UniProtKB/Swiss-Prot annotation:
Gene3D superfamilies: 3.30.160.20, 3.30.70.1660, Release factor. Peptide chain release factor 2 directs the termination of translation in response to the peptide chain termination codons UGA and UAA. The keyword Protein biosynthesis applies. This is Peptide chain release factor 2. Pfam families: PCRF, RF-1. It is found in: Cytoplasm. It comes from Haemophilus influenzae (strain ATCC 51907 / DSM 11121 / KW20 / Rd). InterPro entries: PCRF, Pep_chain_release_fac_I, Pep_chain_release_fac_I_sf, PrfB.
Length: 365
């Protein structure tokens, strides 16, 4: 005879957790809003404003994910309960095993939805930019920056996010001095925001003829793409705008005409670059968007600086904090904030970052 009570208890537990999520995620309001959004998208003139239409489409996907998952969970738990009763009446082990398997599947769906509670930040739902900058270590650090770029592109691809290479600056011998990518998709900034910081690589350098161990650093800075409605005042007199010919490692995807744009914000020293379009005008518009987003994120960080400075156990804001150590000779990658380790270094460098990211989000970093 099969064990019934643990399965019944699990059904009750999952039902309770679904009910809690229903309230936390404001299910009824989302159902109502989904109807409104669908109504707006059915209007024949909706595409007269493409930006608004795209924003509505994005909102619909997000709403449908919550609404459909909760509906599926509630219906699925009801179905499993019925299946379990049938198994008990007929004393049918195959039906019982089917009920258990379906219950496990529902639990996975629920856990994914529960994880969304980690994305409670104001801009977590936004698309974002990831700036990578080679630190000390010369060619080794520049090669490391290119490895990080590949890692984040692979990770984004595995999550179904869209990526655009906004700017790339070649290293002196190999690798990259800097790169900026845009990551678009649901909760892109929420997923990546804890990746800001210094990434440290320790390995036997392929650029050292004596095969010595080298330590090099590369910095990542993640910031959200902000809504055009958010007003960021930028004085044109504070800007230095340079145009140049793109010469990055983007191959056919990077233009070779003198249409790349670099904007320097003199008061803050922030530099943004864009070279992913053949049009200088479009590159300038995109660079201004990046500048606004970066200034906004830095302003938010300044506001939080005083509060965080009081908490000694928390890392410094911005570029100064070392977050992860990649020791390739020892086959060990360790997050210095959460203690999470992964010895499959190649998998991590191929984009297997979820364990690190999920742990940092759960830790409230």
């Amino acid at each position: 005879m099969f064990e019934i009570n643990p399965v019944k208890n699990k059904i009750i537990d999952l039902s309770d957790r679904t009910s809690v999520l229903r309230g936390y995620l404001d299910f009824d309001a989302k159902v109502e809003r989904l109807e409104e959004v669908n109504g707006e998208l059915e209007q024949p003139d909706v595409w007269n404003d493409p930006d608004k239409a795209q924003a509505l489409g994005k909102e619909r996907v997000s709403l449908e994910q919550v609404v459909n998952t909760i509906k599926n969970l509630e219906q699925g738990l009801e179905d499993v309960d019925g299946l379990l009763e049938l198994a008990i009446e007929a004393e049918d082990e195959d039906t019982f095993n089917e009920a258990v398997a379906e219950l496990d599947e529902l639990e996975q769906q629920l856990e994914k939805l529960e994880f969304r509670r980690m994305f409670s930040g104001e801009h977590d739902a936004c698309d974002c930019y990831v700036d990578l900058q080679a630190g000390s270590g010369g060619t080794e650090a520049q090669d490391w920056t290119e490895m990080l770029l590949r890692m984040y592109l692979r990770w984004a691809e595995s999550k179904g996010f869209k990526t655009e290479l906004m700017e790339v600056s070649d290293g002196d011998v190999a690798g990259l001095k800097s790169a900026t990518i845009k990551v678009s998709g649901e909760y892109a900034f929420g997923w990546l925001r804890t990746e800001t910081g210094i990434h440290r690589l320790v390995r036997k350098s392929p650029f050292d003829s004596n095969n010595r161990r080298h330590t090099s650093f590369s910095a990542a800075f993640v910031y959200p793409e902000i809504d055009d409605d958010i007003d960021i005042e930028i004085n044109p007199a504070d800007l230095r705008i340079d145009v140049y010919r793109a010469s990055g490692a983007g191959g056919q995807h990077v233009n070779k005409t003198e249409s790349a744009v670099r904007i320097t914000h003199m008061p803050s020293g922030i530099v943004v670059q864009c070279q992913n379009d053949r049009s200088q005008h479009k590159n300038k518009d995109q660079a201004m968007k990046q500048l606004k987003a970066k200034l906004y994120e830095l302003e938010l960080q300044k506001k939080n600086a005083d509060k965080q400075a009081m908490e000694d156990n928390k890392s410094d804001i911005g570029w100064g904090s070392q977050i992860r150590s990649y020791v390739l000779d020892d086959s060990r990658i360790k997050d210095l904030r959460t203690g999470v380790e992964n010895r499959n270094t190649q998998a991590v460098l191929d984009g297997d970052l979820d364990r690190f990211i999920e742990a940092s989000l759960k830790a409230g970093l």
